[in-house]
UniProtKB/Swiss-Prot annotation:
Keyword check for Transferase: yes
In-chain residues carrying the UniProt-annotated modification N6-(pyridoxal phosphate)lysine: K231
CDD domains in UniProt: AAT_like
Swiss-Prot/TrEMBL keywords: Amino-acid biosynthesis, Aminotransferase, Histidine biosynthesis, Pyridoxal phosphate, Transferase
Gene3D superfamilies per the UniProt record, alphabetical: Aspartate Aminotransferase, domain 1, Type I PLP-dependent aspartate aminotransferase-like (Major domain)
The organism of origin for this protein: Legionella pneumophila subsp. pneumophila (strain Philadelphia 1 / ATCC 33152 / DSM 7513)
Gene: hisC2
The name this protein goes by in its record: Histidinol-phosphate aminotransferase 2
Length: 369
């Protein structure tokens, strides 16, 4: 008798719609047989990674790579803590931010009477990982201008809310919540409810924020801030994220972490990248100029777009976006349609170099005109 393995997992996994990343350059080249491809789909740094990080990687010894990592004893811990103005015992290093969300759910929401809370059009990984663990999810609607209504989140939160997930700025919309609203949320929710503030795009929005969320950690020990080396530092391929939280929360995460979760190359590269302020400033300058370039192009074509504090813009095609998406693929340009978020008329485009942005806008004009 044959076994239907599809029926063996629990219902949460059987009904799961997996996260689908942006199409890769290799995948498109194989599908279309083209080689001149630009990827503006996954919010990667178009300048590449920090040159200081690359230099360290290129001079790495074979013995260093051959040894197992020891992240909690690596000098990155003290250096990152000093850079963030926190204590090393407040840091937890991770194989990207996604693993942070999973381990937090396992530790603080995986109970029969607990649920998580987020909002519509939030980063899809929160719901995917909660569903895989059969943790109930409550989601509040957002406003007409795509803003997150913090009062609605406060009203939806109760003693059974294990974790609130909020990305600030949000992905895939790019919308920023002002810090006073986040502070109000912290003051209103139960002390047993964790607020996980996903700040993957923090560096792009920092100039618009009046307060650093890390300043609230002492007053609000239920705050967990997550950040990453994937975006501004250009290290998405090395997978290194981190959480900043109360030491008691960090200790719990360390109890259940997988062994050797952060690799040697990522640790050394991040240690070097923290010092690369020239690269950070170049990345921010390119992003700011590219944002204006894309906005001007959209305005010329009367295309509506959402206000963004990230390194991407989400725009409205006013019809199903797949026709434009496929047209761009045929022209060697990878962007991100947002059907997975039930935003069927929208596309998210990463801000690229001036040349990449020009090529994208030219293709856009050719499609619409």
């Amino acid at each position: 008798m044959s076994i239907d393995f599809q029926q063996l997992p629990h219902a949460g996994i059987r009904s799961l719609i997996p996260y689908v990343p942006g199409k890769s350059i290799e995948e498109l080249a194989k599908e279309k047989g083209i080689t001149d491809i630009i990827k503006l789909a996954s919010n990667e740094n178009p300048l590449g990674c920090s040159p200081l990080a690359l230099s360290v990687i290129q001079t790495m010894s074979s013995h260093y790579i051959a040894t197992y990592p020891s992240p909690w004893n690596h000098p990155l811990m003290s250096k990152l803590a000093s850079y963030l103005k926190v204590k090393p015992e407040q840091l937890f290093l991770s194989n990207g931010s996604d693993y942070l969300f999973n381990i937090l759910l396992n530790c603080f929401a995986l109970h029969t009477d607990r649920h998580i809370l987020t909002h519509d059009y939030a980063f899809s990984t929160y719901a995917i990982q909660a569903n895989s663990l059969q943790i109930p999810i409550n989601s509040v609607p957002i406003g007409h201008n795509w803003e997150v209504n913090i009062t609605d989140i406060v009203n939806a939160c109760n003693q059974q809310t294990g974790i609130i997930f909020i990305a600030n700025p949000n992905n895939p919309t790019g919308v920023l919540i002002q810090q006073e609203e986040i502070k109000y949320l912290l003051e209103q929710i139960p002390k047993s409810t964790l607020l996980v503030l996903d700040e993957a795009y923090y560096e792009f929005a920092a100039s618009q924020l009046t307060v650093n969320s890390l300043d609230w950690l002492e007053e609000h020990p239920n705050l967990v801030v997550t950040r990453t080396f994937s975006k501004i530092y250009g290290m998405a391929g090395l997978r290194l994220g981190y959480a900043i939280a109360n030491p008691s929360i960090i200790n719990i995460l360390k109890r259940v972490q997988l062994p050797f979760i952060v690799n040697q190359v990522a640790l050394a590269a991040a240690y070097a990248a923290i010092d690369d302020d020239d690269f950070i400033q170049s990345s921010l300058k390119m992003n700011n100029e590219g944002m204006l370039q894309l906005q001007a192009g959209f305005n010329e074509l009367n295309i509506k777009y959402l206000p963004s504090s990230c390194n991407f813009l989400t725009f409205d095609c006013e019809e199903d976006s797949m026709a434009l998406y496929n047209y761009l693929l045929d022209n060697g340009i990878i962007v991100r349609p947002l059907h997975a978020y039930k935003m069927n008329n929208f596309i998210r485009v990463t801000i690229g170099t001036k040349e990449q942005n020009s090529r994208f806008l030219t293709a856009l004009k050719n499609f619409y005109l």
